[in-house]
Amino acid sequence: MLSINRKVRVLVVDDSAVARTFLTRGLSSYPNIEVVGYAVNALDARGKISSLAPDVMTLDVEMPGTNGIDFLKELLPVTPLPVILVSSLNLKVFDALAAGAVDFVRKPDGTESKQSFLDSLAQKIVVASCAKVRRRAAVSPAAPSLSSVSPAGVGGRSDLDRTIIGLGASTGGTEATLEVLKRLPADIPGMVIVQHMPVGFTKMYAERLNRLCRMEVREAVNGDEIRRGLALIAPADLQARVVRMGSRYTLSCLPGEKVSGHRPSVDALFSSMASAVKCPMVGIIMTGMGLDGADGLLQMRRAGAYTIGQDKDSCVVYGMPMVAYDIGAVAVQASCENIAGVLMAHLKGDK
């Protein structure tokens, strides 16, 4: 777990007495976490936030009265408090992330131990205590036009048909990745995306991106061909690696050991690209705690890839991009909102 020199003050918000007791007792067992109180609904939470001054709040998405999403929309513009969602397998979690929540965990459903759930939540709470809360505007389903792109596409067909883009993100990355993808055209070179996310959510995340972006986006399956106009989301709990198959490239999505503490791992993806890809490639590393992806991005740059890192000011957590920049893996830094423009300029050969 990330080490900090103080206890993180946590407010637990859940309408279920059983859930509140479980979370309060469970989180209190961690030496770097102090549960300072609990609230049973949004109205109760507003008062507790004012009186208890928590560093982080855990929030149930589904609550009677004002639900978690509406509560965040009201709260965060005036009180930018890091929030971790505690949610069942539900699309509403992405609406809450769009409203400004930092991260989320899936409620225990019998597929993982309660201790594993608490360990994951505690880790995310500590990370969230270091996060920068960014209030995000609602995303329009219509992607902004790119006036520099001709109807024929973003440039010469041959190079762009063969180009592969890898993107990795963690905490804060679900909305940051959307910010990038919604600014890209439908015929973007083939993309592979690793976003650290609990099991069950990557398919829903891919479906959401597919609705909001111009290119096709879907959760990858083992053996998928990487092709122009398609963005593949690496499935949770599988390692995703690019494999060369003659003149084609496919994505391997298989069980395996964690790499850099994660499965899927950005390092595993980027390292595979550095060793397997013999055509133009781009690596993008975005917001997230830790160092996953930094070494792999360095390997990509040494193999001739163009590499982009999200800048500090626009990151929810400036961890992975910072490490990548510090070791020389990043060719150019850009804000979340400008990464797409930097990428497009590179693909078109603009200087």
Regions found by a protein language model. Give the residues of each.
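Conserved acid/base catalytic micro-environments in cytosolic active-site loops
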Residues: M1-L11, S16-S28, N32, Y38, ...
